[in-house]
Amino acid sequence: VGSEMCIRDSAYVWRVNVGRISLYLLDTDNEMNSEFDRSITHQLYGGDWENRLKQEILLGIGGILTLKKLGIKKDIYHCNEGHAALINVQRICDYVAEGLTYDQAIELVRASSLYTVHTPVPAGHDYFDEGLFGKYMGGYPSRMGISWDDLMDLGRNNPGDKGERFCMSVFACNTSQEVNGVSWLHGKVSQEMFASIWKGYFPEESHVGYVTNGVHFPTWSATEWKHLYAAHFDENFLYDQSNPKIWEAIYNVSDEEIWKTRMVMKNKLIDYVRKQYRETWLKNQGDPSRIVSLLDKINPNALLIGFGRRFATYKRAHLLFTDLDRLAKIVNNPDYPVQFLFTGKAHPHDGAGQGLIKRIIEISRRPEFLGKIIFLENYDMQLARRLVSGVDIWLNTPTRPLEASGTSGEKALMNGVVNFSVLDGWWLEGYREGAGWALTEKRTYQNQEHQDQLDAATIYSILEQEILPLFYARNKKGYSEGWVKTIKNSIAQIAPHYTMKRQLDDYYDKFYIKEAKRFKMLAADGCAKAKEIAAWKEEVAEKWDSIEVVSCEKTEDLVKGSIESGKEYTITYVIDEKGLNDAIGLELVTTYTAQDGKQHVYSVEPFNVVKKEGNLYTFQAKHKMENAGSFKVSYPVSYTHLRAHETRHDL
């Protein structure tokens, strides 16, 4: 597939069959390219910013060209991360080549595009200098039917600001009708993060929504657990995985069977750990007496806590090691033995993450932690599977609210592993009392070091006072009935809500169906509706500044800014629409000042059109404040086109 850039590159297209789904991979390592360009796809995120831009051009523009070559044309295009945002450049070019104007093409592209943002961390949002971006994208504006400045402005928070770089995430927002985060909290964070794109609106008014991530049950549930579920759950379980009623059957499974399954998986993990540690130690020519001592100390009857993930600094893998004296006391308690398994990798350019791994390894080799703190090398999917199915507790300690979703804990709970996490990402929604443990989502200190110290102390206290006593409250059969109850609660009350099936159902119901209907309407009859809306917007833009507020009537209390709660007030505006014919709407927006000092939306109420006389429209709203307090009120005017748009915004 050749992509028309300033430098023409070619890519092999490889197809991987993932179940019944075809995954297409683009590969520039072929003899048709220069030696330099053959390396574009050698490493994910590899090279400098220029190579990063090449990768994103290949993924976005090359991806659409690949689908065209393969004869694949779909109604909806789902852009995961801003890295793929340039799909909409090529899609606009294709529509313009078919005879549409840019304004008509962007209506079709927006209506059929969904952008999912996966992280609030700045490293996940790429910005490119105008010079570098123009080197490879300079030929595209003419094909899109716009100017170079117009293209750059689509990627800027502040259109017209020549000093602002092109942001892929902003471009994705500006060319997608729907945008979503990957958990409820991340959706809220994303509304704040992207608020500057849609000026004049509060973040809460944004159309940015959410779909909380789930995990693929057949992939991440161990065979032993699949057999248990198959034996006790409804026969249609796999086809109805997100049905909570089916999962409640876990309460009918005997405690002995639950505990036996957990111990089988735990022993498999410990055998794997011993084997890997022995091989790694011998490879590194370590002291044989130390490896023997370490392996002897791994106790299958001890509480086993796992921590495995990418070692980004916001994941706070260091948190457990804040107070080493207290940690040593916990892991060396002869009555309540506990062991920690750590594994993960840091980004090649993340020196802080690599340093953190080094520190954990150094701590694990200290005499008081030998065999109690274990770091496993070569983190991969196989090790991840063993870890999320073999430990007793899955620990997650991100800095709030930087964990967009997280999925490792979801994988663990499918295997009867109990979560202990900060209330961030998916766990903010998933946590149920009696089905796991949580650190509060509220910050106590603005100083991150102080917050880390508090969170670490909380982890130690919950371990000492709640988790360890419950785990070791063993009956005559050798297990804790309270612990098994916690496992059952976790599976019954949380697991059904975090399957991939539920996630896909949410995307289908919230976005795919809505966009498919919208796109079908706009594309029908030679794109007649898209052309109509584009023409309507052009007319509104020409006359917008001439719209005039003729009069405003409010009660005296409203004018003074002091109103009585529970009492209804009437506000009336007369507006001259200057011949736009039902083009505008008026709303009453009430806001309050939160503890963070920011204004937040309390309510949004539409005005009703109660009278029309030529171009004069009389808008009226009846307003009643039910609660006392200090509020601000505004009356924003917006334009509407109800026949084509289901959202308040012109996006």
What are these regions (language model features)?
Residues 1-4, 8-643, 648:
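Catalytic cores of carbohydrate-active enzymes across secretory and cytosolic contexts
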